[in-house]
């Protein structure tokens, strides 16, 4: 399956046909394919890459992995759910990519003891009832019912280039 530009038109190849079109609408989402961490246990059903409903995690131990707005917003939303134990793990020592208001809300909940912050840290293993996190050269094993990985996405860059789509990378400010 492919899309290539050909003389001002697009040739769209699917598993069933080849079509020509003057325009093509790509509905691939904003993030593309979620970025995985390639850690043992990441294929368990308790691992997701986007939080849909914080209520589904009521009374659970939840690990959120990431340092951008999606991760901070997920942790903050989970903190509002009764009896939920939230840990946020991020590989860097500070949140360079998250908006100030998200960092401030997170800091407040960390001070209140609603969110445990582990940074810099690295998720090393996911088990059915626990996770192993490396921090300060020490592995901590935490009870765990769910893992939400907010590590961004991988765009289909080569596919888009072949289709004649010009891309420009822009970086936000903290």
Where are these regions (language model features)?
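A Rossmann-like FAD-binding core segment of flavoenzymes
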Residues: 1-13, 18-19, 81-169
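Short, conserved acidic/polar surface loops in the N-terminal third of protein domains
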Residues: 8-10, 23, 34-39
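Short, well-ordered coil/turn residues that connect adjacent beta-strands
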Residues: 22-23, 28
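Glycine-rich dinucleotide-binding loop and its adjacent helix/turn
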Residues: 28-81, 86, 167-174
């Amino acid at each position: 399956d492919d899309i290539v530009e050909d003389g001002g038109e697009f040739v769209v190849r699917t598993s069933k046909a080849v079509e020509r079109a003057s325009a093509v609408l790509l509905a691939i989402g904003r993030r593309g394919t979620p970025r995985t961490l390639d850690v043992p246990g990441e294929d368990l059903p308790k691992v997701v890459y986007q939080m849909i409903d914080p209520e589904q995690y009521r009374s659970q131990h939840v690990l959120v992995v990431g340092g951008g707005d999606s991760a901070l917003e997920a942790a903050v939303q989970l903190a509002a759910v009764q009896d939920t134990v939230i840990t946020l793990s991020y590989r860097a020592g500070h949140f360079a990519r998250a908006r100030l208001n998200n960092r401030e809300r997170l800091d407040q909940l960390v001070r209140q003891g609603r969110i445990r912050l582990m940074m810099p840290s690295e998720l090393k293993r996911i088990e059915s009832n626990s996770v192993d996190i490396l921090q300060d050269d020490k592995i901590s094993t935490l009870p765990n019912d769910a893992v939400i990985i907010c590590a961004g996405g991988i765009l289909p860059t080569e596919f888009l280039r072949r289709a004649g789509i010009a891309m420009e990378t822009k970086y936000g400010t903290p």
